[in-house]
Amino acid sequence: MSISKIESVNAEKQSPVGTEIGTHTPMMQQYLRIKEQHPDTLLFYRMGDFYELFFEDAEKAARLLDITLTTRGQSAGMPIRMAGVPFHAVEQYLARLVKLGESVVIAEQVGEPGATKGPMERAVSRIVTPGTLTDAALLDDRRDALLLAANMHRGVLGMAWLNLANGEFRLMECPAESLQAQFERLRPAEVLIPDGLALPLMETLAPALRRLADWQFDADTAHRLLTTHFGTRDLAGFGVEEAPVALGAAAALYDYAKATQRQSLAHLTGLRLEREAEFLRLDAATRRNLELTETLRGEPSPTLLSLLDTCMTSMGSRWLRHALHHPLRDRTIPAARQQAVAALVGDGDGLHAQAVRGALRGVADVDRITGRIALRNARPRDLSALRESLSRLPELRQTLAQIGDEGMVGGLAAALDVQPELLQCLQRAIADEPAAMVRDGGVIAAGYDAELDELRGIQTNCGEFLMALEARERERSGIANLKVEFNKVHGFYIEVSHANADKVPDDYRRRQTLKNVERYITPELKAFEDKALSAQERALAREKALYEALLDALSPYIPALQGCARALATLDGLAAFAEAALRYGYVRPVFSDQPGIEIRGGRHPVVERQVEDFIQNDARLGSTRRMLMITGPNMGGKSTFMRQVALICLLAHVGSFVPAQSAVLGPLDAIFTRIGASDDLASGRSTFMVEMTEASAILHGATEHSLVLMDEIGRGTSTFDGLALAFAIARHLLEKNRSLTLFATHYFELTRLNGEYPECANVHLDAVEHGHRIVFLHALEDGPASQSYGIEVAALAGIPAPVIRDAKRRLRALENREVGAGPQADLFAALPDDDDAPLSHPVLIALAEIDPDSLSPREALERLYALKRLSA
């Protein structure tokens, strides 16, 4: 199917200026015909050294790229709006447009000037969309660019996604309410959905959304397309037959990707059905709150990824990002990864990890280079980088052999054993320092092809021939300053000054007359010129043919290269885990079949790097201790403590060591967080509504094997409403969900739950008052806190002193007031006089410091005047 059909699903499009194409100039007719096939994309139309855009495309590009909008004459009686970018800088403009979610069609000149009447022939050479990028210049080397197709049927969300840069093809079916969580996990660059699907949330989540015809999302079409592609009778071997909604999405995705690449997708060698149950459940709020790869402000650091990513290759960085967003529920693979990390750490000297990281240094992006080879758009320097990377593999395998051949390390070493003939082929074929593009020549190595060597020899010997000819002609003509030279405009020529023009032999034919010299050509020089120029053109054509043949020869190695790339990425990620363990003192966690979490000396991996003295804390949860009711002052460290427990569990389930003295972890199926909130203006939801929505998801989804983090639930509404909700939610978690819960609150009434539910333990993060200052200890202690120190924190924040004094007075009054039956009291009602309330007035403080028996009459008088001034 053509991309034009994919894009024209709603209605027939008119030409950009709303007139019949035939009324335009021939060149504009050619442009409009191409544009008609791609109405929803920007068209870059090659004209000489520029890519031009016209009409509405020009206006849009000028606005998005901040380039000049001008006019270029008229067509059909109307001015042609035009904007353009130089061809040599096109990649940077494409990158900017793709980041903005735009797609671009590039039409190149394919004809020869003057070969036909009318404009030079042009044809579409590339279609660039956010989800189908393969060029290194357009891709973020540390983040995957995924193309995702989604469909909905009877409450089932079917998804298919493709990483075109490396050929990974995945499917999943899940409940429709999982949409946001899945999008937060996958972060697709471009999304395809049926034209008839009404899904407002998708409009918000998708960075680049494209609607396709409903009939393209058909499971039967998927069977036909995919069995043809994989060369199988059915799809049973891939285990995807049970997911018809996802298969329909896969059909639309495959057709779209193939149309954009304009060729077969040879590197799509498999199809895998993922299931939600494979991974720890992390909803969108949890991924944000734990700041795995982005801070709450949307910045790349400081995050867990920015801390751990010391990878030597871009493949390793992408593997690490993926691993953090895909903690595995089955602990077999995480345990195997931890065994490999332990092998790299060794006895604590880190020599194995250092050796592996040293061998990986300088390894290119084999993953994406392999994809470009399969798509036949690999550039010469891709192949030279692949050659250099493959040459490092023997050293890397030798290092792994010294570590051991058991477990995951042995499997990775085996995957690195790529056939030696592949490296030999690249060493023979590609020049040591090839040109950037095949069209520039100098790509194929000398000695690889006899015909190419002969043609290059003609060019190489050109200088010797010209020097010999110049010497002979000087002797024959007697003109001592005669020169034989070359330029691109006039080719080869013999140059003679006007003063010697009468001495030239009869066989000289004038080629050009200049102010001071005459330029000639002879039959011998003309014959050599034809041969030399022909050799250059033939050499370039031969080199292009050899390069295409080389890509063909590399195709059978694509599966092996894909396996090698996966092994390199995994090894790099595991080495980064080992580096973190060595650098920060992480330990190997222990997985247990008994429910619970037992952490000694736990730390927050990111926060501990931001502060000078981080206080370690223990955490113990189990069947008889399912909830920790955490109280304590603001800034005391409650949120940090809860997050560190969650991050330690997550790191264990991705296969890393953890920041603790020890950690024993029982089975987990999910991590839920309700930490902080802000208004969701786009959806019209208040802070409290966001808070309740997240709490609802937890109460409906958490199980006895889930870790739940609840931070100050109920604070977004009135005091009694919030307290009532917090109490009811805590009881539900204890009675119904029976989750392992960390429940932080300032409602001290909740600490009474311990009397009704022994499995709810009270703990607090303490603080002490030192003079007029408050010191946060950040240490977790048993029992409830004595107070929240909220007013003291307000003073630290710079709230004016009169406000602080007024707040203290009102707090004392509220604490002394009996809360009776009836409606909720008004916090802002006038306070009754309270003569017994001790006020911290400066006069009272000064009086308390006076010892009357020790004062002389003069000192007493001075103190009296001082008190008078204080009371003024």
UniProtKB/Swiss-Prot annotation:
<keyword id="KW-0227">DNA damage</keyword>
<dbReference type="InterPro" id="IPR007861">
    <property type="entry name" value="DNA_mismatch_repair_MutS_clamp"/>
</dbReference>
<dbReference type="InterPro" id="IPR045076">
    <property type="entry name" value="MutS"/>
</dbReference>
<dbReference type="InterPro" id="IPR036187">
    <property type="entry name" value="DNA_mismatch_repair_MutS_sf"/>
</dbReference>
<dbReference type="Pfam" id="PF05192">
    <property type="entry name" value="MutS_III"/>
</dbReference>
<dbReference type="InterPro" id="IPR017261">
    <property type="entry name" value="DNA_mismatch_repair_MutS/MSH"/>
</dbReference>
<dbReference type="InterPro" id="IPR000432">
    <property type="entry name" value="DNA_mismatch_repair_MutS_C"/>
</dbReference>
<dbReference type="Pfam" id="PF01624">
    <property type="entry name" value="MutS_I"/>
</dbReference>
<dbReference type="GO" id="GO:0005524">
    <property type="term" value="F:ATP binding"/>
</dbReference>
<dbReference type="GO" id="GO:0030983">
    <property type="term" value="F:mismatched DNA binding"/>
</dbReference>
<keyword id="KW-0234">DNA repair</keyword>
<keyword id="KW-0238">DNA-binding</keyword>
<keyword id="KW-0067">ATP-binding</keyword>
<dbReference type="InterPro" id="IPR007695">
    <property type="entry name" value="DNA_mismatch_repair_MutS-lik_N"/>
</dbReference>
<dbReference type="InterPro" id="IPR016151">
    <property type="entry name" value="DNA_mismatch_repair_MutS_N"/>
</dbReference>
<dbReference type="GO" id="GO:0005829">
    <property type="term" value="C:cytosol"/>
</dbReference>
<keyword id="KW-0547">Nucleotide-binding</keyword>
<dbReference type="InterPro" id="IPR036678">
    <property type="entry name" value="MutS_con_dom_sf"/>
</dbReference>
<feature type="binding site">
    <location>
        <begin position="632"/>
        <end position="639"/>
    </location>
    <ligand>
        <name>ATP</name>
    </ligand>
</feature>
<dbReference type="InterPro" id="IPR007860">
    <property type="entry name" value="DNA_mmatch_repair_MutS_con_dom"/>
</dbReference>
<dbReference type="GO" id="GO:0006298">
    <property type="term" value="P:mismatch repair"/>
</dbReference>
<dbReference type="GO" id="GO:0140664">
    <property type="term" value="F:ATP-dependent DNA damage sensor activity"/>
</dbReference>
<feature type="compositionally biased region" description="Polar residues">
    <location>
        <begin position="1"/>
        <end position="17"/>
    </location>
</feature>
<comment type="similarity">
    <text>Belongs to the DNA mismatch repair MutS family.</text>
</comment>
<dbReference type="GO" id="GO:0003684">
    <property type="term" value="F:damaged DNA binding"/>
</dbReference>
<dbReference type="Pfam" id="PF00488">
    <property type="entry name" value="MutS_V"/>
</dbReference>
<dbReference type="InterPro" id="IPR027417">
    <property type="entry name" value="P-loop_NTPase"/>
</dbReference>
<dbReference type="Pfam" id="PF05188">
    <property type="entry name" value="MutS_II"/>
</dbReference>
<dbReference type="InterPro" id="IPR005748">
    <property type="entry name" value="DNA_mismatch_repair_MutS"/>
</dbReference>
<feature type="region of interest" description="Disordered">
    <location>
        <begin position="1"/>
        <end position="22"/>
    </location>
</feature>
<dbReference type="Pfam" id="PF05190">
    <property type="entry name" value="MutS_IV"/>
</dbReference>
<protein>
    <recommendedName>
        <fullName>DNA mismatch repair protein MutS</fullName>
    </recommendedName>
</protein>
<comment type="function">
    <text>This protein is involved in the repair of mismatches in DNA. It is possible that it carries out the mismatch recognition step. This protein has a weak ATPase activity.</text>
</comment>
<dbReference type="InterPro" id="IPR007696">
    <property type="entry name" value="DNA_mismatch_repair_MutS_core"/>
</dbReference>
